[in-house]
């Protein structure tokens, strides 16, 4: 029998795949996902169950009425067997009455027990309810029912012949027809195995026919009702427990607040009593002081008179007054003057004789329940927030052992201890970093749950070289992308959208795995689905394995497209088996990866591939909120001579509009213009839509996140702050020499470097080229990327190259005329390329040229000293004979005596007899003299050699 997949059934009946999978599991079928296959009978069962679910349930209503009027006698059935009675029995009640059904079943069982006895009931139970674990009992019950039905059929034939009544109007025949239909239905469901027993009837004279389907449905409904009652009881118990727990928490909180209020009232009463005592003490001191002043005033004039009389009697001492007397006179005079001034002019002069004014009481402010603080708050700021005097807080801090003034900053721990002493709950204020745009991607509260809608999937196509990735992309674009402007020319911006079955799919055109890896390193997970292309004739290749690892690291589902099935050597089964070794298992083998056999060249099964993409996207349930401010990721960036920085963005959440203030990576700006993948200007971009924008002040990096801010001022502040942080981080990465890394620094000083400046057309090419050059492995030499940027080669690049002794590499760009002229003047080398492999080879050759030459020793020959001659003012001359090879004039020699090297040096002269020669061959004799060595002896061995340079590979 043929099989069907669940998503095909869902498409046929117009239901979602998720509903069909759940319904199949409910029917007891062993399925795992939308790709699981079922038999044709099971498929019909699923379709019929969906059609029954959409229609009113007539079966359950039919089973209630007949059971209430069922009688064991056959004659009663004949009396009540009219067509009108049948119609009334089939009519559907308005509502189910489970109590009435249970009473009807009880009456039916009692009647059956009286008529047939317990044996019939046991047989009926065994025949009516199939027990899966007891097949033998079911077969025996079926045989008994068949024998009874055969006898009853013979009786009815005799009755029909005698009465000449048509079997169509016979009530017994109606019951038989029902039994036959019921037996056929049971045969379809696999309940009876003997085909001869299907058309036979159960005798109505002994027991009425039982509608097993109706009874099963009724029991199922009753079980569901009981389960719902239990669930409701359990839910109510949980709600009651929650309510009691909440009530207990509220009571505990109220008790704590009450205790705190009582403590505060006691503290306030104590403070009030202290203030009253201080007020009384001050008033008593003031009254005592005023009394003493009045007493001194009364005694002041007599003292003056006595003093004046005393001085007048002394003669010469008349004009000499003591210092105390002068002060007394002056004070008295001043007091009288003030007194007269007050009485004459009515000035409000303080009178010491009046009673003191009452001290004004300070207005009492309640302490706050919570206090939100920031690190570094001063005592004065805290006092103002909690409405207390700074002196009071300083006093409390002093009692806690902290010496502080009202302008001194406090740390968080001290502030918390101070608030605990006041009985206030202290909370640190959470500082929101406006420059951190990553928080929008991590904060779940950023989205509105009621506004979330379905979005288009983002698909990345990966695979080995020459496996058809580019061909598939071209096929999809040419066949599915709508024509653009004049001539159907479209602008390629690194990402594009196609439409299939009324739904959009976004494809990312990320050439090579380097860009994908760099985006993963920065955490830019923008891909929802990966299409892995494998050639049917090549199978799994190294880059295929690399693509599998990248997709698993990204955590995205994989759809395998087996390409080139039109070739003669295609073997899709081998590809499936090889991918299974790396954890990519087909759904046909019980895995979770979809496999589609396609031919991108001949446009074969492309529709099936797109349907699979939409199916996987439906299972993944990709959602987005288009109402919030837009956030997303940079796909590509480049520098245009006329437009400036151009960035290709993929909107992931929210909607991006023209004139929105935006922060992209470490740069900022305002969206000046927005162009879609067809080269048309648009005013807004919804989630999963790729657009190209202008208006940024600098070129961002591929893989950076972007976010829209409320106003341009906030965006500018966030962008400048992010730029400062990036610069500070770059400076912190500079390694300084210490004792720990001294050896590594000295070792690194021995390594030669090749300085390069990289300029390319797009940011992705800059990153890929820089990463490829750094990975070049040449022992003793490394590449140092001095500067890398997007755009043409200008004068500043030439100046930097001259200062750092670097080579400028231009990838798909050209130098300006001024830069070329300056490079010729400053003797700066500029290399222009359009193929990355050529750049790598050229830089590798330059690195090898930086290395010092490596030499290898080559032995030329050996000679034996036969005689020595000592010549004055010249030295020792050795007569030799060559025993192996040759001895040349420009070779170096070693003097070996008793297998020990005595001397190693150059030849001073080489002669054959009396003639100077360039070399002496094998078995020839000659004379030689060695520079700076005269200790030659007979039987010394002379070894001649030269040093040859080794070519590096």
Curated annotation (Swiss-Prot):
Residues 191-207, 282-291 have a biased composition (Polar residues). Residues 463-470 are annotated as: G1. Keywords: Cytoplasm, GTP-binding, Initiation factor, Nucleotide-binding, Protein biosynthesis. Residues 488-492 are annotated as: G2. Residues 339-348 have a biased composition (Basic residues). Residues 80-89, 98-111, 140-188, 229-248, 300-317 have a biased composition (Basic and acidic residues). Residues 509-512 are annotated as: G3. Residues 599-601 are annotated as: G5. GO terms for cellular component: cytosol. Belongs to the TRAFAC class translation factor GTPase superfamily. Classic translation factor GTPase family. IF-2 subfamily. One of the essential components for the initiation of protein synthesis. Protects formylmethionyl-tRNA from spontaneous hydrolysis and promotes its binding to the 30S ribosomal subunits. Also involved in the hydrolysis of GTP during the formation of the 70S ribosomal complex. This is Translation initiation factor IF-2. It comes from Streptococcus pyogenes serotype M18 (strain MGAS8232). The gene is infB.
């Amino acid at each position: 029998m043929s099989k069907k997949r669940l998503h095909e059934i869902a498409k046929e009946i117009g239901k979602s795949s998720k509903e069909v999978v759940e319904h199949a599991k409910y029917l007891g079928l062993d399925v795992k996902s939308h790709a699981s296959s079922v038999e044709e009978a099971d498929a019909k069962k699923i379709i019929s169950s969906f059609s029954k679910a959409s229609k009113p349930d007539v079966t359950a209503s039919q089973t209630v009425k007949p059971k209430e009027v069922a009688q064991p006698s056959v004659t009663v059935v004949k009396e009540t067997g009219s067509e009108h009675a049948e119609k009334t029995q089939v009519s559907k009640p308005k509502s189910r009455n489970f109590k009435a059904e249970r009473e009807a079943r009880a009456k039916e069982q009692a009647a059956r027990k009286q008529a047939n006895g317990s044996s019939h009931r046991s047989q009926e139970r065994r025949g009516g309810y199939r027990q899966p674990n007891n097949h033998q009992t079911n077969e025996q019950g079926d045989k008994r029912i068949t024998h009874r039905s055969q006898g009853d059929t013979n009786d009815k034939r005799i009755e029909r012949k005698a009465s000449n009544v048509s079997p169509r109007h016979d009530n017994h025949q109606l019951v038989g027809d029902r039994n036959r239909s019921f037996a056929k239905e049971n045969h379809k469901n696999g309940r009876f195995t003997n085909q001869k027993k299907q058309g036979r009837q159960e005798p109505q004279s002994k027991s009425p026919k039982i509608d097993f389907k109706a009874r099963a449905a009724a029991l199922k409904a009753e079980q569901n009702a009981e389960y719902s009652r239990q669930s409701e009881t359990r839910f109510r118990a949980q709600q009651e427990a929650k309510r009691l727990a909440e009530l207990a928490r509220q009571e505990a909180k109220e008790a704590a607040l009450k205790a705190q209020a009582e403590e505060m009232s006691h503290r306030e009463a104590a403070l009030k009593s202290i203030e009253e005592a201080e007020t009384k003490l001050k008033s008593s001191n003031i009254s005592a002081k005023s009394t003493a002043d009045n007493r001194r005033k009364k005694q002041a004039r007599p003292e003056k008179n006595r003093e004046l009389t005393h001085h007048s009697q002394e003669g010469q001492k008349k004009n000499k007054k003591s210092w105390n007397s002068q002060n007394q006179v002056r004070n008295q005079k001043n007091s009288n003057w003030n007194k007269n001034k007050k009485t004459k002019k009515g000035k409000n002069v303080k009178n010491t004789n009046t009673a003191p004014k009452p001290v004004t009481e300070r207005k009492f402010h309640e302490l706050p329940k919570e206090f939100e603080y920031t690190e570094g708050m001063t005592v004065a700021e805290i006092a103002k927030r909690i409405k207390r005097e700074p002196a009071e807080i300083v006093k409390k801090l002093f009692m806690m052992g902290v010496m502080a003034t009202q302008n001194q900053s406090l740390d968080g721990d001290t502030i918390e201890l101070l608030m605990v002493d006041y009985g206030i709950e202290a909370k640190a204020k959470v500082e929101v970093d406006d420059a951190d745009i990553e928080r929008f991607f991590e904060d779940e509260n950023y989205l509105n749950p009621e506004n979330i809608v379905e979005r288009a999937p983002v698909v990345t196509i990966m695979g080995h070289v020459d496996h058809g990735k580019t061909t598939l992309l071209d096929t999809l674009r040419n066949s599915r992308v709508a024509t653009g402007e004049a001539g159907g020319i479209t602008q390629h911006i690194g990402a594009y959208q196609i439409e299939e079955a009324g739904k959009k799919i976004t494809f990312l055109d990320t050439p090579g795995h380097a860009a994908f890896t760099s985006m993963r390193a920065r955490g830019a997970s923008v891909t929802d689905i990966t299409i892995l292309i494998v050639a049917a004739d090549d199978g799994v290749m190294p880059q295929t394995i690399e693509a599998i690892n990248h997709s698993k690291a990204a955590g995205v589902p994989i759809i395998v497209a087996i390409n080139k099935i039109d070739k003669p050597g295609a073997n899709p089964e081998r590809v499936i088996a090889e991918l299974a070794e790396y954890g990519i298992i087909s759904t046909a083998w019980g895995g979770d990866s979809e496999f589609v056999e396609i031919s991108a060249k001949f446009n074969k099964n492309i529709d099936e591939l797109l349907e699979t993409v939409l199916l996987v996207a439906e299972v993944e349930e990709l959602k987005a909120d288009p109402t919030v401010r837009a956030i997303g990721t940079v796909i590509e960036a480049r520098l245009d001579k006329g437009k400036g920085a151009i960035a290709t963005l993929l909107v992931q959440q929210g909607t991006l509009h023209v004139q929105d203030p935006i922060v992209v990576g470490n740069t900022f700006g305002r969206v000046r213009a927005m162009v879609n993948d067809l080269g048309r200007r648009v005013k807004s971009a919804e989630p999963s839509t790729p657009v190209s924008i202008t208006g940024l002040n600098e070129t961002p990096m591929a893989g950076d996140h972007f976010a829209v801010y409320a106003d341009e001022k906030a965006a500018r502040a966030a962008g400048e702050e992010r730029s400062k942080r990036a610069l500070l981080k770059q400076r912190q990465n500079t390694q300084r020499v210490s004792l720990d890394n001294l050896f590594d620094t000295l070792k690194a000083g021995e390594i030669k470097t090749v300085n390069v400046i990289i300029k390319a057309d797009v940011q992705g090419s800059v990153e890929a080229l820089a990463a490829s050059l750094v990975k070049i492995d040449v022992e003793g030499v490394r590449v140092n990327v001095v500067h890398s940027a997007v755009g043409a080669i200008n004068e500043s690049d030439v100046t930097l190259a001259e200062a750092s002794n670097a080579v400028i590499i231009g990838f798909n760009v050209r130098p300006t005329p001024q830069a070329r002229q300056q490079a010729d003047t400053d003797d700066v080398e500029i290399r222009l390329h359009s193929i990355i492999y050529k750049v790598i080879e050229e830089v590798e050759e330059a690195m090898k040229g930086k290395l010092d030459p490596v030499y290898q020793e080559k032995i030329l020959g050996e000679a034996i000293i036969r005689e020595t001659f000592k010549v004055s003012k010249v030295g020792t001359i050795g007569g030799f004979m060559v025993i192996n090879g040759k001895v040349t004039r420009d070779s170096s020699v070693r003097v070996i005596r008793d297998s020990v090297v005595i001397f190693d040096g150059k030849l001073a002269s080489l002669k054959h007899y009396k003639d100077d020669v360039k070399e002496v061959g094998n078995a020839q004799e000659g004379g030689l003299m060695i520079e700076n060595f005269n200790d030659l002896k007979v039987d010394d061995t002379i070894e001649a050699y030269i040093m040859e340079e080794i070519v590096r590979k």
